[in-house]
Amino acid sequence: MKTLLIHSDYLEFEAKEKTKIAEDADVLSGKMDECLTVFIAVEKDDESDPDAVVKNAVEEIVKTADNLKVKNVVVYPYAHLSSDLGSPATAKEILAEIEKELSGNYEVLRAPFGWYKAFKISCKGHPLSELSRKITTERKEEVKKEKVVSKFYIINGENLELTEVNDEVISKMEDKGLLALLKHELDIKEEGKENGEPPHVKYIKEKEICDYEPSSDAGHFRWYPKGKLIRDLLSDYVYNLVVERGGMPVETPVMYDLQNNAIREHADKFGERQYRFKQGNKDLMLRFAACFGQFMMKKDMYLLPKHMPLKLYELSTYSFRYEQRGELVGLKRLRAFTMPDMHTVCIDMKQAMEAFEDQLWMGLKTGDDFKTPYAIIFRFTEDFFEENKEWFFGMAKEYKQKYGKDAILEILPGRKHYWVGKVDMAVVDSFGRPIENPTVQIDVESAERFGIVVHDGDKKVHPIILHCSPTGSVERVLCGLLENAYLNTLENRPPALPTWLTPVQARVIPVGDKHSAFALDVATKLRASGIRADFDDREDSMGKKVRNAGTDWVNYVVVIGDSEMESGKLTVTVREESELKKAKKEELTVEELIEKITSDVKDAPKRPLPLPMKCSVQPIFR
């Protein structure tokens, strides 16, 4: 914000003509004697925290008025002070708030926004009669006042005992995943802990999954065919998961107009760094989740209690967060990502809590299906927890029975977010750092902010809304899978993806030319059965072909030689059942191999291999 403060004998104005952004004002002319005239230009930066800029502007005006010993203040919109103006909606809101804050102790006259005005002013002409000030959104003292100190507990679901976290509790924790998550929450950094490049970054390049796109912004990726296949399979998985549970898929825009008050307030509340830009006279932002579009859609729906709980689901391709360059780490933290995002409208808190519990188990199921066990943390405001602790203890008990694990509980003394309760689930990477993935949140603000109502007889009710990402971002899911694959190597097992996600599920390798026709026939039968199989016809040694299959993490490697052709029994190396230095081999017929792979994949999503069957003509992408 830019301001020009004039100690005036008088200020007189008259509004002459409206512009298209003019406010409907009651006062279109006025005069004030012996006053401080404050010319104000609201700037784009002010949109990041309107409350802070109002507070700082009022403090500066009060300080100047008191120094000059004046009790009359004129608030005068004056766009010519800046070339980087904020949106009209934000400017109107800020100017009105400044007037409101000053009115308790001063006589205030505010000129209307968005009008062509004639004015006369007489400046007193003493050394302090003309002052210019740059007002920022900085919150120095307020940050200290508003700092919320949470309490952390370990909940044992077996005896429902809450143990407040302290150094002794931390030193005795045996669950490495839960300990890593707790240390992350408490910002405990361990000396000597690795801070280099995590293994998954090497894997995504080496396996031709994806890589940074140098001609784009940092944190944006190019995806190769194998990586695109994995992402699509993960997307199919989440789609099936939510649709089976009543989710209705929708699609909404990736950018939004910050002149919409609800959009701007929700964006500011979120607090993450955002991609914001100006196009023409509009201030726009790229979404960081699917909330905006889904909330606007719900606002326009005629909702009745019988529709509840109503679940809308979107795979937001893409969502954007402008993370600092130094914070970008492979697939764990990036600027453009694919977020499965479901929002559930609930008629009341009872229904919201039931849906929360259902979605907790849905999130935990994804860890089971991906073979990436989660550590979990519940977060509640103190009031909400005290009112609903028996419900929480019931979940903790069932979690202990199903998974044999404790959980972390964070209690916040007051509500500083739009939610009163949430649960976060995290995979732990090879450096012992959490990768937060699934989440469920109970939102008690957004329905009112966006004007979402349920028509319940003669009443209009603002519902409770759950935010749920059943898996977290697709990129983070893959990050967790690859980090978990690396951890396999520390347990003498080869790194691998689950068979349903592995791009090449089976590779058929002929020992010599005379075995090629038979081997090709086997590969063809596998593909005809819906198995992603290829055929290594390259002119490499047998040893190199087998090593290449290992490098490509092929789950089932089939070698065809004389004995296989004669007996019809294939020699198959099963990767997920092998040790690092000792391959697990089985002799199977083609039919038995098809049955084994089909049983391995079960009812997981299926897609064909998007590469030529013959390895010799498969392109090299990097």
UniProtKB/Swiss-Prot annotation:
This is Threonine--tRNA ligase. NCBIfam families: PRK03991.1, thrS. Keywords: Aminoacyl-tRNA synthetase, ATP-binding, Cytoplasm, Ligase, Metal-binding, Nucleotide-binding, Protein biosynthesis, RNA-binding, tRNA-binding, Zinc. The N-terminal domain is an archaea-specific tRNA-editing domain that hydrolyzes incorrectly charged L-seryl-tRNA(Thr). Catalysis of tRNA editing is performed by the charged tRNA itself. GO terms for cellular component: cytoplasm. It catalyses: tRNA(Thr) + L-threonine + ATP = L-threonyl-tRNA(Thr) + AMP + diphosphate + H(+). Its cofactor is Zn(2+). It is found in: Cytoplasm. Residues 1-141 are annotated as: Editing domain. It holds the Pfam family tRNA-Thr_ED. Belongs to the class-II aminoacyl-tRNA synthetase family.
